[in-house]
């Protein structure tokens, strides 16, 4: 359901042969996405990459936003004549939400209310007998299966209910032994935040992340809220409730009920860029906490959809740039949307690229990654 540059949850996208992911990551393993320097397609500028997504890959609409500049391609709604929305358009950020959740956890660590090596069972009774630590949850090393592949989309459950489904399954591996992307890790971290802070994780993230950065266009959908607020493009993909319909309009989705701390936030390109700038610019956490998020990492290059040289930390991933250096972000995919981008480490800026249908594998993924790379390498 959500994943870093690509993990689309198996349940969500089985109809289109996407293996569990969320994303940035998603729920299952993969063969890896476009490699460093191998985005393909022959494009060079951001606009050329977006045009490839629309003209060759069949993506209805695509946008790249960097600084005060937006580049768009395609339409906001096929058949309507509406141009693709610009920087004001809202979209579901998918697994980029994991970075917000990780920041909230590290805020509690900085305040002395959590330690990364605490056992999750100290805060989540269902895991009382498990050795899984918060560090392992943050780094996707817990071995917990992905709840996204187990849900009944006609019967939403509480977070405890989803975790209960997971605990009936065999673990993917012993905690800490391997790396395996799973939305369940951040489902559990949302529960930890609630217990440690004494308030719902949505409220805590609003108070400690959204409000300090002034992210007024970023929000958690409420219970039963299916439509996006404000201006937005329509989204197209396989609807989890009606996979037999094939590709259809999936703009309206039950985000509150299913995506939560793993992928439930709605945002705009400007707000998401402001988040990355705020996080890596020191506006949200002490410097040591950001350093821990980005230095306690696992090599995930060539796994899932990560290019060679990528590393996964605490809800953030670093991806190499063809012009040298790297950028930190996360990425995310849901039915009808893929999001890439982040902040370069050497002052080259911050960018968000998103499409109005899933671009989590093959040429689409390569072209989306190419647009991010072109923007951060100055090839506009």
Pin down the residues of each PLM region.
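Short active-site loop at a secondary-structure junction
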Residues: 57-60, 80-137, 173-182, 260
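Structural recognition of the beta-strand scaffold that forms the well-ordered cores
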Residues: 63-65, 92, 136-138, 180, ...
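Short, surface-exposed loop or secondary-structure junction motifs
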Residues: 77, 131-327
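Bacterial N-terminal signal peptides
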Residues: 13-21
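Primarily hydrophobic membrane-targeting regions of prokaryotic envelope proteins
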Residues: 49-53, 65, 93-113, 119, ...
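Catalytic loop of the DD-peptidase/beta-lactamase superfamily, centered on the K-T-G motif
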Residues: 2-6, 27-71, 247-380
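Hydrophobic membrane-targeting alpha-helices
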Residues: 20-25, 108
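Sec-dependent signal peptide hydrophobic core
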Residues: 5, 9-14
